[in-house]
UniProtKB/Swiss-Prot annotation:
Tissue specificity comment: Expressed in roots and in the abscission zone of the sepals, petals and stamens of flowers, at the base of cauline leaves and in the basal cell of trichomes from senescing leaves. Found at the site of lateral root emergence, in the dehiscence zone of anthers and maturing siliques. Also expressed early in anther development, at the time of microspore separation. Expressed in germinating seeds, at the point at which the radicle broke through the seed coat. Not expressed at the junction between the seed and the funiculus or in the dehiscence zone of anthers or pods.
Main localization of the protein described in the UniProt heading: secreted
Enzyme Commission code: 3.2.1.15
Organism: Arabidopsis thaliana
Keywords: Cell wall, Cell wall biogenesis/degradation, Glycosidase, Hydrolase, Repeat, Secreted, Signal
MF-aspect GO terms: polygalacturonase activity
Encoding gene, per UniProt annotation: ADPG2
UniProt record, GO biological process: anther dehiscence; carbohydrate metabolic process; cell wall modification involved in abscission; floral organ abscission; fruit dehiscence
Protein name, entry field: Polygalacturonase ADPG2
Amino acid sequence: MARCTNLVTVFLLWALLMFSWCKASRISPNVYDHSYKRFKSDSLIKRREDITGLRSFVRASLRTPTTVSVSDFGAKGDGKTDDTQAFVNAWKKACSSNGAVNLLVPKGNTYLLKSIQLTGPCNSILTVQIFGTLSASQKRSDYKDISKWIMFDGVNNLSVDGGDTGVVDGNGETWWQNSCKRNKAKPCTKAPTALTFYNSKSLIVKNLKVRNAQQIQISIEKCSNVQVSNVVVTAPADSPNTDGIHITNTQNIRVSESIIGTGDDCISIESGSQNVQINDITCGPGHGISIGSLGDDNSKAFVSGVTVDGAKLSGTDNGVRIKTYQGGSGTASNIIFQNIQMDNVKNPIIIDQDYCDKSKCTTEKSAVQVKNVVYRDISGTSASENAITFNCSKNYPCQGIVLDRVNIKGGKATCTNANVVDKGAVLPQCNST
């Protein structure tokens, strides 16, 4: 009977894959076809993601998951006892086991953790069930790597599920008070990212709350085939450098159905990222949804195939932004921002190629090339006089900028060194300089 059930499961999964292939072929695309000067379908990329995810799903579905609880390894969950070693021991057991494994952090408890690195590769198909609260130590001496609190490193086919009750709490107030951005008399020092995923393939993060990170809340670095959904990320508007979801050097990632309010970018997308899908995001407070900053310290930067489709931004310092330093090189290309509502947003649409967050930035000849960017079905109100700003490089002007059915009230448009085409009704219209 069990064998028959497994065969039925495989058949149903095969049918699901066939359906997803058909659906993928109808998806509006985000890859630019230069021969036809239009965007073409990313269905082949989508199909590769489906195959990779299906393989892991089938393997896990054919086994009954084993549960490994941190409580079985001595975790107290009283919010006072250091539970770091219990988590490390539970991880080693779960990672080294065969088949599907659930690593359980029980609901209703608070687990105090120092910095912790959970490394792969793992034998198991692993789901980390964070149903309780993870609470960060506030002692600087408890961090072996001052830039990271919880890190998953080199773990393929990993799922992290908060079950709608799980919380990752960075207890960032102590770190913010010592930030040079809050107190100019303080030296600028590093602070931990709350949750880091590094060098991992086929990653799922869902149903999780992350709050008050010491610095960045969730960082996804050097990963591929990633799905992030139904996460709630919060920090005060004045908390320094608390980016919500930070994506760098990552390919084939989708972030969807999430609520983000922070003291920095709600979502930031940096160099090396390709085929990024952002859907159904609520953002505010924060600095908006940003690509960059790119080209820092005269570096090469490449970002391509980014689609932000469905977002509501309220009271943010920026709306949708591309930011690059002078002196860099490379490209930011094939980007779509569409179906976006802005409510009282400063700088709703902005490309800034003179970005500088340092004490001194010099004028340079080289720049990251920004090209093939579409803004479609964007409406709302500007909280500043600048509703649309294209401040592009004199030496490498922005190319292929399209405004299609854009209606932002309360501000003007200024377009410098930008090749802009209007489609449909556009308000305000560019005053090119």
